[in-house]
From Swiss-Prot:
UniProt record similarity statement: Belongs to the AccA family.
EC numbers on record: 2.1.3.15
Species of provenance: Acaryochloris marina (strain MBIC 11017)
Signal sequence, start to end: none
Enzyme superclass (EC): transferase
GO cellular component, one term: acetyl-CoA carboxylase complex
Protein name as it appears in the record: Acetyl-coenzyme A carboxylase carboxyl transferase subunit alpha
One GO MF term attached to the UniProt entry: acetyl-CoA carboxylase activity
Domain CoA carboxyltransferase C-terminal: 44-298
Chemical reaction(s) catalysed: N(6)-carboxybiotinyl-L-lysyl-[protein] + acetyl-CoA = N(6)-biotinyl-L-lysyl-[protein] + malonyl-CoA
Keyword ATP-binding listed: yes
Pathway: Lipid metabolism; malonyl-CoA biosynthesis; malonyl-CoA from acetyl-CoA: step 1/1
Alphabetic keyword roster: ATP-binding, Cytoplasm, Fatty acid biosynthesis, Fatty acid metabolism, Lipid biosynthesis, Lipid metabolism, Nucleotide-binding, Transferase
Keyword Nucleotide-binding assigned: yes
């Protein structure tokens, strides 16, 4: 990616680090051109850059975590599928005449193990985002996902779900085609599946749009992803009639991985490479692959009945709250 493109995609809190990294590159380039040894100076600046990176990314606010989860260069479902699978074949259609590109899915192998992988798919540029409706599925997307999950259950394939959507599409056409019914059906049916189900929030986990493929035996979450009943801006617009109150809503909604693990919503936080998954997608893919294989090994030790029971009780036990004195 060109430097100018990278700068256009920088988040505000990333800019001090990017400026320091640019300075290091300039010094290194001048050193090579003039034959001057600046190894010590570069090492000192790189140490400062690493320290600054740790300071920035260890103290992000919930709203900054949301910005990072929406980063335009953040790896998508297809990025992870291609990175972690030995082979993969995409499957299409809901068998009702539609094939929603906002949800992708297919069969493949991870570490030699046959699996079904599916997830929300955002676009990488404006044209692609429009084609994929910014990762917001229509009812046909959820019906396609359920068809593929039924296929996986029939053939004994574990299901790997990647969650990354602002929300399910809420347009008039989506409502006319039964958006609520499609999501509700998926919720009901995923509880009855015999095969292991591992769901991972890789970016945004927004509302029922995330839940529509989010009922699983394990719910994993990258440390800079978010999972929420509604986007903070939408929540702020509802509660305070002002989307600018998004940061306050983000704090109240408890959208971060740390908050959600404390509340018992998610099972495991996956660490990201320093600076976020978009900085080192290959390392991020290796992290998620290791987590998937490890959890699959544990889940295969259980009988189908045990998995269904644990899955049911896992979701029934959600809803921990604290009461002020």
């Amino acid at each position: 990616m060109a430097v100018s493109d990278r700068k256009l995609q920088l988040l505000d809190f990333e800019k001090p680090l990017a400026e320091l990294e640019d300075r290091i590159e300039q010094i290194r380039s001048l050193s090579e051109q003039n034959g001057v040894d600046v190894t010590d100076q570069i090492a000192q600046l790189e140490g400062r850059a690493e320290q600054l990176r740790q300071e920035i990314f260890s103290s992000l606010t919930p709203m900054q975590e949301l910005q990072l989860a929406r980063h335009p260069r953040r790896p998508s479902t297809l990025d992870y599928i291609h990175a972690i699978s030995d082979e993969w074949m995409e499957l299409h259609g809901d068998r009702r005449g539609y094939d929603d590109p906002a949800i992708v899915g297919g069969v493949g192998r991870i570490g030699g193990q046959p699996v079904l992988m599916l997830g929300h798919q955002k676009g990488r540029d404006t044209k692609d985002n429009v084609a994929r409706n910014f990762g917001m599925p229509f009812p046909s997307g959820y019906r396609k996902a359920m068809r593929l999950m039924d296929h996986a259950d029939r053939f004994g394939l574990p299901i790997i779900s990647f969650i990354d959507t602002p929300a399910a599409w809420a347009g008039l056409e989506a409502e006319q085609f039964g958006q609520g019914e499609a999501i509700a059906l998926n919720l009901r049916e995923m509880f009855r599946l015999d095969v292991p189900i591992i769901c991972t929030v890789i970016g945004e986990g927004g509302s029922g749009g995330a839940l529509g493929i989010g009922v699983g035996d394990r719910l994993l979450m990258f440390e800079h992803s978010i999972y929420s009943v509604a986007p903070p801006e939408a929540c702020a617009a509802i509660l305070w009639r002002d989307a600018q109150e998004g940061p306050q809503a983000a704090e109240a909604l408890k959208i971060t991985a740390t908050d959600l693990q404390e509340l018992g919503i998610i099972d495991q936080i996956l660490p990201e490479p320093p600076g976020g998954a978009h900085v080192n997608p290959i390392k991020a893919a290796n992290i998620i692959k290791t987590a998937i294989l490890s959890n699959l090994e544990e889940l295969w030790r259980l009988s189908p009945q045990e998995r269904r029971q644990q899955r049911y009780h896992k979701f029934r036990n959600m809803g921990i709250f604290s009461q002020l004195p």
